[in-house]
Amino acid sequence: MDIVRMGSVASGGGSVRRTASSWRGTSGRSDAFGRSVREEDDEEALKWAAIEKLPTYDRMRKGILTAGGVEEVDIGGLGLQERRNLIERLVRTAEEDNERFLLKLRDRMERVGIDNPTIEVRFENLSIDAEAYVGNRGIPTFTNFFSNKIMDVLSAMRIVSSGKRPISILHDISGIIRPGRMSLLLGPPGSGKTSLLLALAGKLDSTLKVSGRVTYNGHDMDEFVPQRTSAYIGQHDLHIGEMTVRETLAFSARCQGVGTRYDMLTELSRREKEASIKPDPDIDVYMKAISVEGQESVVTDYILKILGLEICADTMVGDAMIRGISGGQKKRVTTGEMLVGPAKALFMDEISTGLDSSTTYQIVNSLRQSVHILGGTALIALLQPAPETYDLFDDIVLLSEGQIVYQGPRENILEFFEAMGFKCPERKGVADFLQEVTSRKDQHQYWCRRDEPYRYISVNDFSEAFKEFHVGRNLGSELRVPFDRTRNHPAALTTSRYGISKMELTKACFSREWLLMKRNSFVYIFKILQLIILGSIGMTVFLRTKMHRRSVEDGAIFLGAMFLGLVTHLFNGFAELAMSIAKLPIFYKQRDLLFYPSWAYALPTWVLKIPISFLECAVWICMTYYVMGFDPNIERFFRHYVLLVLISQMASGLFRLLAALGREMVVADTFGSFAQLILLVLGGFLISRENIKKWWIWGYWSSPLMYAQNAIAVNEFLGHSWNKVVDPTQSNDTLGVQVLKVRGIFVDANWYWIGVGALLGYIMLFNILFILFLEWLDPLGKGQAVVSEEELREKHVNRTGENVELLTLGTDSQNSPSDANAGRGEITGADTRKRGMVLPFTPLSITFDNIRYSVDMPQEMKDKGVTEDRLLLLKGVSGAFRPGVLTALMGVSGAGKTTLMDVLAGRKTGGYIEGDISISGYPKKQETFARIAGYCEQNDIHSPHVTVYESLLYSAWLRLPSEVDSEARKMFVEEVMELVELTSLRGALVGLPGVNGLSTEQRKRLTIAVELVANPSIIFMDEPTSGLDARAAAIVMRTVRNTVDTGRTVVCTIHQPSIDIFEAFDELFLMKRGGEEIYVGPLGHNSCHLINYFEGIQGVRKIKDGYNPATWMLEVTTLAQEDILGINFAEVYRNSDLYQRNKTLISELSTPPPGSTDLHFPTQFSQPFFTQCMACLWKQHKSYWRNPSYTATRIFFTTVIALIFGTIFLNLGKKINKRLDLFNSLGSMYAAVLFIGIQNGQTVQPIVDVERTVFYREKAAGMYSALPYAFAQVLIEIPHIFLQTVVYGLIVYSLIGFDWTVEKFFWYMFFMFFTFMYFTFYGMMAVAMTPNSDIAAIVSTAFYCIWNIFAGFLIPRPRIPIWWRWYSWACPVAWTLYGLVASQYGDITNSTLEDGEVVQDYIRRYFGFRHDYLGYVATAVVGFAALFAFVFAFSIKVFNFQRR
C-alpha cells in the first residue's frame, strides 16, 4: 500500500534517516569530537562523489551506511543484520518515529520538484444485483438438490425461468474517495460494504449484475490493471500455514515487485545530481533497497515493524493442523501482505477483527500518516471502531441497505443526523450510533425532537435528505465535473499485468515450493514408509519360492504382482489431491491479486515432484523386483523401473488436475474415485480387451493404465525366464506368450515403447490441463445464500418505510415456515416480560471461595529450569454471582477468565481444582449442576444442517424435565425465540461458521437460545460479543439483559467492550494476569464506583472525560503500571473494604436459606434412554435430509458407477465357458466393492467429524449419554445405505445378467448391503479413534491398500503363503468376494470351462470358495459391520480428544 509507498518510491520513498541537513548538526558538540566528525564528513563526501560518477545502473545499486563509520555498500548485498540496523535507525518505535520518517521521504522528493502519484477513485450510479432462491426453495434438501440442478439446466437452455429472485445489493450510489484523506466505511451487516470495496478494487464476482461506472483519475477500469493499481484486503485470512510471517510477506513483496519506484528514483537521483543536493545516506539506502528488485526484505522488515509483527516474524503462520500465530496476528499478516506491494489505493475490509483496540489504533494511525504524507488513497471498513480510532479518519461513508446515507467529512455527520431529528447520546461512541441509527429496531432511542412524536425515517428518506444537505450538494456538484485527466501522474496507474519478469516469477514460485516441500517432508517420509510396509507385505505374499513358472495360472499370479505395483503407485498419487486442494484457496487469492500467472504456480509443483517419484519407485523396485522373482535381467529391471516412475508421475498429474477441476475436497474425492475406477476397470486387467463392448472400447484405448500394463507385461513375459514351450501338443507359443494371449494383452515387444510414449504423453497432457484449469476456473462459490421471505420483506421495509402488511399481499405465503407464526410472536412479545416465562425455574446463586486451579508443568518450561511440578493458573479466587445480577468477568489476555468459568461450570477435562463451590448454600455436585446451568461457549458450535427452530426444539426436548409435555415445550421455545429476537430466522439453516448459514451475530444469539431453552437458573457466557459489529453486539447484549431480567444468574467474560456495553452490566469481576482478582463489586451509574475505587489508589492516573472506563481500567492495572507505582493491585484489593464486603456476602450465601433443600434429580439425564435415542435419531434424520452434498452425491455417484459397470460388463454374467469369463465377473464384483466401499468410508468421515464437535458440547451440557448419540449415528446410515444398495443392485444385476433366481438375487443384495455398511462404519470408527478427520483418512487409507492385496483377486487365498493366510480370514473384503462368487457360481455343476473342468470344482480349487459355507460367510460379513459399529460407539464413549 501506500504504507509502502512510504515504501514506494514511486510512491515516494524509502526508509529514511534524518535528512542531510538535520542529520549532522555538529555545531553543538565539543571540540573533542569535532575532528573525528569532520574527518567522517570528508570521507563521506569523497565516497558520495565517487558514487555520483558511476553510470546510472551502478549508481542505483550503491549506497553509504553510516552506522559506526562510513561504509560504501552494495544495495543488492545487504545482510539481515544490516537491514535490521537500517530500519532500527529510521523507525525505532512505530508510534513515534514513523511520521518523521515519512516526512523525510516526502521532503526528499519535493526538494527537487517530484510529486507523489495520487489516485482519485470515483463511482457513479453504481448498482449491483444478485439472484437467489427465496424461502424453502433455497434450503438444500435431498429433493431440492435434484430439482434445482434440473431447473438450472433447463433455464440455461432457456426452456423455463430458474425461479431465482433478483436481490439488490447496492442501489444507484455515487461518490468520491479522495487521495490524501482517510475514509471510513461504516454500515450494519448486509448493507453492502464488502460488495462496494470489491467493486472499487475491480474484483467483483462475474455472476453479479453490475451497472454504473468506477474510474481511477478519470480512467475506466479497462484502461489499466486495477488489481495491481489498488490492493483489496479481504476479511478471510488465507495463508500457507507452513510458512513463517516473514516468508509470507517477503514472497508477496517479491511477486508484487517495485512498481514505478525504480524509474522515479532514477529521475530523483538525476535531479539531485544536477542541483548538487546530497541526500541523507540512510534514506538513500532505504529508497534504493525498495526500488531495486531482489531487496524485498527491506520493505518486509519495515512493514513488520509498523504492524507490530516483529515479535512473531519467524513463527509459522499455522493452520488447523499446525500451531501458529494468534488470530489477531493472522489478521495483520493479511494486511501486511498487500502493504509490502507498490499499490497506491487501499480497500480494506474489516481489518480489525480479533485485534484489541490499541493495536487497531496503531495500525490505522500508521496508515493515516502514510495517506496524509504520501498522498495515498484509502477506504477502510471497520467493525467496532473505538472512539479514538474513529477520530483518525477524515471522511465517513455510511452505507445502509445498499444505499449511501452519508459521505463526507467526519465533522459534519452528527450535524446531518441532528437535522434529521436524531442525536448521539453522550456516553455512546459515534461509530456505534451511526450503525444503529438507520435500523428500524434501534432508531427510536435516538429521536431527539421532544415536541414531535417519533416516526420511522427510512433509508430512502435519509438518502434523499443527504442530497439536499450542504455536504451532499457539494459532492453532487463535484461529481458533475469530470476528473481532469491531464492531472493524472504517469506513474499513478499500473498497466503491466505482473510486477516482475516471467523468469523472476518462476524463480519465486520455485523457491516457495521447495521451501514447502522441506517443511512438509514428513508427508514424503510417511509415503515412503507406507510403500516400505506395502512392499514388505507384497513381497512376502508373492514370494519367489512360491512363484512358479509352470502354467498359465502361474502367469496370472505374476500379473497380479505387477498389477499390485502399478496400482500402489497409482493410489500413492492420491495424496496429491488433498495437498493440492489445501493450497487452492491461497492460490486463487494470489492469482486474482496478480501475484503470478497459473503456469508459474503449476510448474514447480510438477517439476519438483519428479525426484520424489524416482525415489519412491526405487524403494519399491529394490524391495520387490528380485524377491518376487521377476525376470533377472538388468535391462528389464531398469525398464520396469522407468515404467513405475512414469505411472507415478502420471498419477500425480492426474490427481493435481482433478484437484483443479473439483476445487473442493468432497467433489474432487468423487472425481478422484471416478478416475481411478475408469482407469482400473478399462485398463485391461479387470476385464480383458476382447470382452470390452464396442461402445466402451475408446475407454480402453484412452486408459493410461492399459498402456502401462501392456508395457510392463510385455517387458516381463517376453523375457528369458518365460521363453519355454510347456506343452507342444497344445501350442507352440512360449509360456510367456500364452499368458499374454489368455489375458488379452498384445504380444509385440514394441508395446513396451508404445506404453512409455503414451505415458509421457499423458504426463504432459495432464499437467498442461492442470495449468489451463487453474487459469480458467474460479473457486466454487459459497453455498448459495438462502434468503427467507421475512428477510426480503425486512430489507424492503427498512429501505422504503412502507408498512409491512401491504407487502404480504403480493408474496407467496407458503414459502416460509415462519409466516404462520410471524404475527403471533409480535403479540406475545409485549406481555411475556410482565408475567415471566411459561415454565417456572428456581433462582439460584453460586459462590466460590479460595479457588485454586493448576496443571502439570509443561515440559518446555521444565527444560528452561523451572523446578515446580505444577503451574498455578488461579490463585485463590473468591466471589458470588446472584440471581437478577449481570456480572462481567474481565481481565487482560492470560488473566484466567475462561479458566475460572470452565472450573465453575465443571467443563475442565484435566488439571487440579481446590476450594469450595456452593449452589445456594449447598456443595456443588456436577451431575445435578449440569441440569440447572447453561454454558455459552465462545465458538458457536451447532449442527450445521438443521434449522434454528429445530436446534432449539432438540435442546428443549433433551434438557427440559420429562414431565413437560410437547405443547408446553413448543410454547417455551417460541418464548425464548421471541426473547432473543430469533423469530424471523426460525426456518433458517444454521450452516457452518464462515461458510454458509447464519451470520456470526445470529449464531451468538442461537448459542444463547440453545442454553435458555433448557430453562437454566445459572448461565455462563464466554465472550458473547467478540467478532461482532456495534449493532450486533447491542442486539446480543439486549438478549443477555432480557435473560437477566427474568431472574436468572448470568456471568459473561467480555473482551474490550464499548462504553454502552460495559455499562449494561451490574457488577464487575476484574482479574489480573496470573489468576488473581483485583476488583469485585458494583459498577455504579456511569461506572462511578469502579472509577472511584481505582482513582482512590495513589498514583493511578485519572480518567479523561468521555473515555471508556473499561479501556481505562485495563490500561491502569497492567503489570507495567504495577512496576511503575510499586504496588500489587491484588494486595490492594485484599486490604480493601470491598474485599470484606464480598467475604461477608460469600459466607451469607454459603449457608442454605431456612426451609430449603439441596438440588436433587432422580436420574442423571432429564430424559430416559429411549427418548434420548429418539431425539438424537430425529436430529440426525433432519441433518442427513438437508445435506445433499453428502447424501445426494452418494446416490448420484452410485447410480453413475452402476450404469458404467452395467454397460461395461453387459451380459457377462451369463458367459461362463472360459476362465477369463469368470475373471471378468469377479473383476466387476471386486471393483464395485472396493470403489463404492472406499468412497462410502471416505465421505462419511468429515460428516462424523463435524457432528462429533457438537457431541462434545451437548454431552458436557448433560443432554444425553454417549450411546444414544452413537446409536443414532449408526442407525441413520442404514436406510441411506439400503437405498444405495437397491439402486446399485438393481441396475448392475440386471445389466450384467446374473442368474435371476430369488436366492441368488437375495444373496447378491445381502452381501452388497452389508459390505457398503461395514465400509461406512469403518470410516466412522476411524474418526472416533483419532483426533480429526485428516488423521482418520490417513489411518483408514493404509488399511484399504492391505485389504486390496488380500481380497482374493490379485492372488487367490489357496496361493497365499501359509504365513499370510490368516490375514485373508481377517480381511472383510475377502469375505465379501467369497460370498458374491460362491453364491453366483459355487453351485453350477452343469457347465464346464474350456478344459472340461466343472465350474463348481474350479471355483473350489482355484479360489477355495464353497457354496455350502454361505451361512458362515454371511455371518462373518454381518459380524464385521457389527464390530466396526461397536468400536465406533465404544470409542465415542471412551475417547475425548477435546482438551480444556
From Swiss-Prot:
Main localisation: membrane
Binding site residues for ATP 1: 187-194
Domain ABC transmembrane type-2 positions: 504-717, 1171-1385
Source taxon at top rank: Eukaryota
Record: residues binding ATP 2: 891-898
Membrane topology note: Multi-pass membrane protein
SMART domains, per the entry: AAA
Keywords, alphabetical: ATP-binding, Membrane, Nucleotide-binding, Repeat, Transmembrane, Transmembrane helix, Transport
Any one GO molecular-function label of the UniProt entry: ATP hydrolysis activity
Annotated ABC transporter domain residues: 154-426, 846-1098
Sequence ranges of Polar residues compositional bias: 19-29
Cell compartment(s), UniProt: Membrane
InterPro entries, A to Z: AAA+_ATPase, ABC2_TM, ABC_trans_N, ABC_transporter-like_ATP-bd, ABCG_dom, ABCG_PDR_1, ABCG_PDR_2, P-loop_NTPase
Sequence intervals crossing the membrane: 522-542, 555-575, 610-630, 642-662, 667-687, 754-774, 1192-1212, 1220-1240, 1278-1298, 1305-1325, 1335-1355, 1362-1382, 1414-1434
Signal peptide: none
One Gene Ontology cellular component: membrane
Pfam families the UniProt entry points to: ABC2_membrane, ABC2_membrane_7, ABC_tran, ABC_trans_N, PDR_assoc
Region of interest called Disordered, as start-end residue ranges on this chain: 1-36
CDD domains attached to this UniProt entry: ABCG_PDR_domain1, ABCG_PDR_domain2
Family: Belongs to the ABC transporter superfamily. ABCG family. PDR (TC 3.A.1.205) subfamily.
Protein's job: May be a general defense protein.
Full protein name: ABC transporter G family member 39
Gene, per the UniProt record: ABCG39
